[in-house]
Amino acid sequence: MSPAVLESKAAYDIIKERFGDAVSEFDANPTMPFFEVLDASRWVDIALYMRDNSLLQFNYLACLSGMDYPEEEKLGIVCNLECIGKYTHKLAVKVKCQRDGGSIPSVSCVWHTANWHEREAYDMYGMVFEDHPDLRRILCPEDWTGYPLRKDYKVQETYHGIKVPY
Amino acid sequence: MGLLDAKVSNRNVLVTSVDNVMNWARLSSLWPMGFGLACCAIEMMATNASNYDLERFGIFPRSSPRQSDLMIVAGTVTMKMAERVVTLYEQMPEPRYVLSMGSCSNCGGPYWDHGYHVLKGVDRVIPVDVYVPGCPPRPEALIGGLMKIQELIRMEGLGISREEALKKLAEKSVDAQQVLDQTRKAAIA
């Protein structure tokens, strides 16, 4: 493991110690080491802990992207977390939910950046973020049908009488 | 210059047709609707800037559709924006002209196959008079397109519809390859 990954591992160990089975094993991916939140209902607790623990201080949500896993019948998010200031560790966190009607707790109260990012993930993949203050589509028009980044997405034939496909 | 061909008597009397004067006035003060959609808009702004100086043609962007006679659709028209473009177009008084600038606006550009969110050509929602190809077109190309609009205006007149004017223009059309060959020959010589 490179020094950067070792740093991330050290941060992960603190989280694992506190949350035990709610988080998965550490994946020592050299570009972006990550772990998965197995119990999605504890995601906000974990997020708050990661932000506020003095040894972790993940105060910067660099990115939150959506993911589609059709073979697992799941949707998910990937959060890239960093610390600005005291530490240089980086971690990605994955959270998954059911593909149909699934929901993930919103972390927009933990990192305000998440507000728009979660709206984007909702717009593109269609998972619901519980307790999000303003969950509306952000890129597509309000009355757009379907979620464009799902792997089985089929574009609609017309939108307000305008032909959509080529 | 249509007017300069007209006969001017020694008492400063100018003899010409109403069509001629009206069209000359219209084509010498084109006011494009001032809005841009994507990267082509940067090129459009560059064209309006001092280096290319569109004001020598009397072309100056106007911020209100009610006083514009030309719409330059510069850039990617998304489905979300398409309806707004139509609204702007409908607010413009007639006679109005539309210049579609760049591949995106002409046919969807790089999004023509996989871009679910892009209108595959602005002519699906509003009629287009002149298409300027390119991604994005250089200011020279846009100026070429604007001059084409001016030619179209010159062909129009009282009792001559846009269709007839377009037909007349088509008769005058030159083969692009021929022009290129000539220019190349001239450059070598």
UniProtKB/Swiss-Prot annotation, chain B:
Listed cofactors: [4Fe-4S] cluster
Enzyme Commission code: 7.1.1.-
PROSITE patterns, per database record: COMPLEX1_20K
Membrane topology annotation: Peripheral membrane protein
Cofactor comment: Binds 1 [4Fe-4S] cluster.
GO molecular function: 4 iron, 4 sulfur cluster binding; iron ion binding; NADH dehydrogenase (ubiquinone) activity; NADH:ubiquinone reductase (non-electrogenic) activity; quinone binding
Transport found in the keyword field: yes
This protein's record includes keyword Transit peptide: no
Binding-site positions, [4Fe-4S] cluster: 39-40, 104, 135
Native source organism of the sequence: Chlorobaculum parvum (strain DSM 263 / NCIMB 8327) (Chlorobium vibrioforme subsp. thiosulfatophilum)
UniProt protein name: NADH-quinone oxidoreductase subunit B
